[in-house]
From Swiss-Prot:
The species this protein was found in: Bacillus cereus (strain G9842)
Pathway involvement of the protein, from the record: Purine metabolism; IMP biosynthesis via de novo pathway; 5-amino-1-(5-phospho-D-ribosyl)imidazole-4-carboxamide from 5-amino-1-(5-phospho-D-ribosyl)imidazole-4-carboxylate: step 1/2
EC number per UniProt: 6.3.2.6
Alphabetized PROSITE patterns for the sequence: SAICAR_SYNTHETASE_1, SAICAR_SYNTHETASE_2
EC category name: ligase
Family: Belongs to the SAICAR synthetase family.
Lineage: Bacteria, Bacillati, Bacillota, Bacilli, Bacillales
Gene Ontology process terms (BP): 'de novo' IMP biosynthetic process; cobalamin biosynthetic process
NCBIfam families assigned to the protein according to its UniProt record, in alphabetical order: purC
InterPro entries on file: SAICAR_synt/ADE2_N, SAICAR_synt_PurC, SAICAR_synth, SAICAR_synthetase, SAICAR_synthetase_CS
Name the UniProt record assigns to this protein: Phosphoribosylaminoimidazole-succinocarboxamide synthase
Length: 239
C-alpha cells in the first residue's frame, strides 16, 4: 500500500489517499492543541504515542466484536484505516464529573456518576463544537434518529469495554470522545482515535491525570503522562 497525496490535515492528524479506493493512510502529528486551537505546541513523540495507544485500544475493541475503521499499524506514527464518511458529531461518554460538565452542572470534579451520561457535540470549529440535543441533530440533518440511537448504543458498549480494560491497568476512565463513520454499505463503525487526547484518564488511587488535561492545565510533562498510559496498556514505552 502506497501513501499518495494529502487529502486532509487536522489538528492532530494528516489523511492521505492510497491506491485503494476504500482505504486511507493516517499520520499522527506531534502537535498539541487545546481550547479549540487557541493553545498550541509541538511535543516530540506525541504522534507516536497516540498512534500506539489507538492501535492497542482499537484492536481490543475488535477482539470483542466492535467494528472499527482500523486495519493495521504501518509505522510508529502511521496506520491504515477504512475510508468512511464521518458523521459530524462528537459522542462524549462521561462516567465521572469533570471538565465542562463540572462547570455546567455546578458539581464537584471527581463525583462518580450513578450511570454514564452520553452527550452529542456538533463538529464545527467556527461554532466551537456546541453541545446539541437529539432535536438539534434532527434540525441540523446530520444524522437520522435511528443513527443517533446506534451511536448512543455503541458508545455505551465501548464505554463498558474500556472501563474494564483500563481498570485492569489501574486507570479510571473518566470520560472520552468518539467519532463514527458510515461505510459505503451504510454501516456505522467507530472511526478517528482513542487516546489520551480524546479521553480523561486518572490513576485509580491518586487521581493523577494521564491525559490532555496535563497540557490544558499545565500540570506537567505531557509525553510522560502518555508514556505511562502506553506502558500500563502493555505497549512499548520509550521512557
Amino acid at each position: 500500500m502506497q501513501k499518495l497525496e494529502l487529502l486532509y490535515e487536522g489538528k492532530a492528524k494528516r489523511i492521505y489517499r492510497t491506491e485503494s479506493a476504500d482505504m486511507v493512510w493516517v499520520e499522527y502529528k506531534d502537535s498539541a492543541t487545546a481550547f479549540n486551537g487557541e493553545k498550541k505546541e509541538t511535543i516530540t513523540g506525541k504522534g507516536r504515542l497516540n498512534n500506539e495507544i489507538t492501535t492497542l485500544l482499537f484492536r481490543k475493541l475488535q477482539e470483542v466484536g466492535i467494528k472499527t475503521h482500523f486495519v493495521e499499524k504501518l509505522s510508529e506514527t502511521e496506520q491504515l484505516v477504512k475510508k468512511v464518511s464521518i458523521i459530524p458529531l462528537e459522542v462524549v461518554t462521561r462516567n465521572v464529573i469533570a471538565g465542562s460538565l463540572s462547570k455546567r452542572l455546578g458539581m464537584e470534579e471527581g463525583t462518580v456518576l450513578a450511570e454514564p451520561i452520553v452527550e452529542f457535540y456538533f463538529k464545527d470549529d467556527d461554532l466551537g463544537d456546541p453541545l446539541v440535543t437529539e432535536d438539534h441533530i434532527r434540525v441540523l440533518n446530520v444524522a437520522s434518529p435511528e443513527q443517533v440511537s446506534v451511536l448512543r448504543d455503541m458508545a455505551l458498549q465501548i464505554n463498558q469495554v474500556l472501563i474494564d480494560h483500563f481498570a485492569s491497568c489501574r486507570v479510571r476512565l473518566v470520560d472520552f470522545k468518539l467519532e463514527f463513520g458510515v461505510t459505503e454499505e451504510g454501516e456505522i463503525i467507530l472511526a478517528d482515535e482513542i487516546s489520551p487526547d480524546t479521553c480523561r484518564l486518572w490513576d485509580e488511587t491518586s487521581n493523577e491525570k494521564f491525559d490532555k488535561d496535563v497540557f490544558r492545565r499545565d500540570l506537567g510533562n505531557l509525553t510522560e503522562a502518555y508514556e505511562e498510559i502506553l506502558k500500563r496498556l502493555g505497549g512499548i514505552s520509550h521512557v
